[in-house]
Design a protein with these regions (language model features):
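Beta/alpha (TIM)-barrel catalytic core signal, keyed to glycine-rich beta->alpha loops juxtaposed to Asp/Glu
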Residues: 1-166
Length: 166
């Protein structure tokens, strides 16, 4: 109704578990099924365009778990979102700061840990942006430095993932 009134252009859903768990888990949701439901209710111009889920170097299921299915092909939630034209925002890029401690996150470039974490997430295919909780102005300034660094290209990113997961 609010879409018909022009008050809401697009909408989405945020979840902590539903897109990270396996199909056998009661909390599991299929993105393909959700998009189909949106089409049944709102037609092809349904407005369901975004999801938000946890993703970082510790919570890597969005990239590595093939727990979704699109056209009967097992894919990750990020692959599913790309195929279904759903934008992905991610949460907890630093795991409430735990990933920023020395030695916690794998080394893969010369960046400081916060920028390394943001670079990994924003270079992941299908991710629009990581959503970062920040309390201090100096953290905002530090995290904005990522804007001066180009994302990792797809081939290099896939090679990095292979290196980090082998």
């Amino acid at each position: 109704q609010k879409r018909d009134e022009g008050k809401i252009k697009f909408y989405g859903m945020a979840t902590w578990e539903c897109f990270r768990v396996g199909i056998e888990n009661p909390q599991y949701l299929s993105l393909e099924n959700i998009v189909e439901m949106a089409k049944k209710i709102g037609g092809n111009d349904h407005g369901f365009k975004f999801i938000q889920l946890p993703f970082n170097m510790n919570y890597d299921q969005a990239l590595l778990a093939k727990n979704q299915s699109v056209q009967n092909k097992p894919v990750s939630i990020l692959e599913s979102a790309v195929t279904l034209d759903i934008g992905v925002f991610t949460s907890v890029p630093f795991m409430q700061g735990r990933l920023l401690s020395p030695g916690v996150m794998p080394e893969f470039n010369e960046l400081k840990p916060s920028l390394r974490a943001l670079q990994f997430i924003r270079s992941s295919p299908g991710v629009l942006a990581p959503l970062v909780g920040q309390k201090l102005p100096e953290h905002v300034s530090e995290n904005l430095e990522i804007m001066n660094i180009p994302p990792i290209n797809n081939d290099d990113f896939l090679a990095l993932v292979k290196k980090l997961t082998s």
